């Protein structure tokens, strides 16, 4: 009996040690966050800052996002106005004609922000022509997922004492270029997470991140099954995700690496799948406008790509929902513990 307890205690100590150990002297578990552009990777990355032990963005850190948020408001209204003009839509309110002209020429960065610009955005967002063109998003033009959130909150942003909230920070968008790195502790385990640019031009920078990875978290935007790439408008976004996952999961770099798929933007997908049939873009799907049927079909498409023996775990996520990501990351932590336990007992 004492011998069994000693063996079990040793295994427990080994698991604890291995989970904290990375190659060399670093006491961290290395997570590689991969996926195509706009799959929600960077939002997941920011969530880690919030859900970590004693986490969250400080006031000073949130203030640094102000001009990013201002820039998001301006750039997304410019997209809408440009799309409206291209479709020959005129503003309902004659006063907005000059605003159409202004936003067709405006520089989209946060440096263009003024209280007058904030009022322009408020008036344009309430115009029927802009609302009509907004409903055409994903068909004729590409708009960020959080555009409506920013427009709805424009009055708050215009306050001279405005301090971004955690939600504002999560919804803000800056294209990831190169490699972003963060160190955080979650339930007493040290993690090192690397977020790399998802656009095609950024993927060549991934290669040197592949060494000593404990797990790959691969993000897929469920809601983009009917959308095309910004870089190549003839390529379906979900098909691009499938191609990328196929390349990564079957790479020799990851033969012994755990894979965790985050099927992200589940909230947007639930709204869209009730109106737009997945079968229009993936003819093998015959499950109709069913959320359950469509999510299981998509999940199977990805899981079937693996030709190796890796264990692949899947979670349906909403990256802007902190409670959801905290719940999912508890499961991810348990997955890593079990993976290391299985490695030790099979050693």
Curated annotation (Swiss-Prot):
According to the UniProt entry, its GO molecular function terms are: G protein-coupled receptor binding; G-protein beta/gamma-subunit complex binding; GTP binding; GTPase activity; metal ion binding
G1 motif as annotated region, ranges: 30-43
Name the segments for region: G5 motif: 317-322
By its UniProt entry, which Pfam families does this protein fall under? Answer: G-alpha
GO cellular component annotations of the record: cytoplasm; heterotrimeric G-protein complex
Quick one: which residues bind GTP?
Answer: 35-42, 170-176, 195-199, 264-267, 319
Cite the entry's keywords alphabetically: GTP-binding, Lipoprotein, Magnesium, Metal-binding, Myristate, Nucleotide-binding, Palmitate, Transducer
Q: Which residues form the G-alpha domain?
A: 27-347
The annotated region (G2 motif) lies at 168-176
Quick one: where's region G3 motif? 191-200
Q: Which family does it belong to?
A: Belongs to the G-alpha family. G(q) subfamily.
- Give the protein's recorded name: Guanine nucleotide-binding protein alpha-5 subunit
SUPFAM superfamilies, per database record? P-loop containing nucleoside triphosphate hydrolases, Transducin (alpha subunit), insertion domain
Sites of N-myristoyl glycine lipid linkage? 2
GO biological process: one example = response to bacterium
Complex formation: G proteins are composed of 3 units; alpha, beta and gamma. The alpha chain contains the guanine nucleotide binding site.
S-palmitoyl cysteine lipid sites = 3
Q: What does this protein do?
A: Guanine nucleotide-binding proteins (G proteins) are involved as modulators or transducers in various transmembrane signaling systems.
What is the protein's species of origin?
A: Dictyostelium discoideum
Q: What is the lineage of its organism?
A: Eukaryota, Amoebozoa, Evosea, Eumycetozoa, Dictyostelia
Q: Which CDD domains match?
A: G-alpha
Could you tell me which InterPro entries the record lists for this protein?
Gprotein_alpha_su (IPR001019), GproteinA_insert (IPR011025), P-loop_NTPase (IPR027417)
Domain of life, per lineage: Eukaryota
**Keyword check for Lipoprotein:** yes
UniProt region (G4 motif), positions on chain: 260-267
> Which residues does the annotation say bind Mg(2+)?
42, 176
């Amino acid at each position: 009996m004492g011998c069994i307890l000693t063996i079990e205690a040793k295994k427990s100590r080994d698991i604890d040690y291995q989970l904290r150990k990375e190659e060399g002297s670093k006491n961290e578990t290395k997570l590689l966050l991969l996926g195509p552009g706009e799959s929600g990777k960077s939002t997941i990355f920011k969530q880690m800052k919030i859900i970590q032990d004693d986490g969250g963005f400080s006031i000073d850190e949130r203030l640094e996002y102000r001009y990013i948020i201002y820039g998001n408001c301006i750039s997304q209204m410019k997209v809408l106005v440009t799309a409206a003009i291209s479709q020959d839509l005129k503003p309902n309110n004659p006063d907005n004609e000059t605003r159409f002209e202004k936003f067709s020429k405006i520089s989209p960065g946060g440096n263009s922000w003024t209280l007058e610009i904030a009022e322009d955005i408020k008036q344009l967002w309430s115009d029927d022509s802009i609302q009509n063109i907004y409903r055409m998003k994903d068909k004729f033009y590409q708009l960020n997922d959080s555009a409506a959130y920013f427009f709805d909150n424009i009055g708050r942003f215009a306050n001279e004492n405005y301090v971004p909230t955690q939600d504002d920070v999560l919804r803000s968008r800056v294209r990831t270029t190169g490699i972003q790195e963060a160190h955080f502790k979650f339930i007493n385990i040290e993690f090192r997470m690397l977020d790399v640019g998802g656009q095609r031009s950024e993927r060549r920078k991934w290669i040197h991140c592949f060494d000593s990875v404990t797990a790959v978290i691969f993000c897929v935007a469920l809601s983009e099954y009917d959308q095309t790439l910004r870089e190549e408008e003839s390529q379906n976004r979900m098909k691009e995700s499938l191609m990328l996952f196929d390349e990564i999961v079957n790479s020799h770099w990851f033969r012994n690496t755990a894979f965790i798929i985050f099927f992200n933007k589940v909230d947007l997908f639930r709204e869209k799948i009730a109106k737009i049939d997945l079968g229009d873009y993936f003819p093998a799907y015959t499950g109709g406008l069913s959320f359950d049927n469509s999510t299981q079909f998509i999940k199977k498409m990805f899981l079937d790509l693996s030709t190796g023996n890796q264990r692949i775990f899947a979670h349906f996520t909403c990256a802007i929902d902190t409670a959801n990501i905290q719940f999912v990351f508890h499961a991810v932590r348990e997955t890593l513990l079990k993976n290391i336990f299985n490695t030790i007992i099979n050693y």
